[in-house]
Swiss-Prot record:
GO terms for biological process: translation. It holds the Pfam family Ribosomal_S17. One of the primary rRNA binding proteins, it binds specifically to the 5'-end of 16S ribosomal RNA. This is Small ribosomal subunit protein uS17. It comes from Cereibacter sphaeroides (strain ATCC 17025 / ATH 2.4.3) (Rhodobacter sphaeroides). Part of the 30S ribosomal subunit. SUPFAM superfamilies: Nucleic acid-binding proteins. The keyword RNA-binding applies. It comes from the Bacteria.
Amino acid sequence: MPKRILQGTVTSDKNEQTVTVLVERRFKHPLLKKTVRLSKKYRAHDPENQFKVGDVVRIEECAPISKTKRWKVVTEAVTA
């Protein structure tokens, strides 16, 4: 099964080797036919502490690293 890759914004970098990433997704509601925005926070592994608040990053699913971390930061997303 392929690993999921998501893109989001770093909202917290206060923990050692961990960042909190806010991932927002949009979809059309099946009944209301309206675009709905949902967001979810993921805790991701950042071994070098290189990402700061406000950075747009890509995170990849991985084996559990701790109680709450199941994602790792792959790269900083290119914003054009």
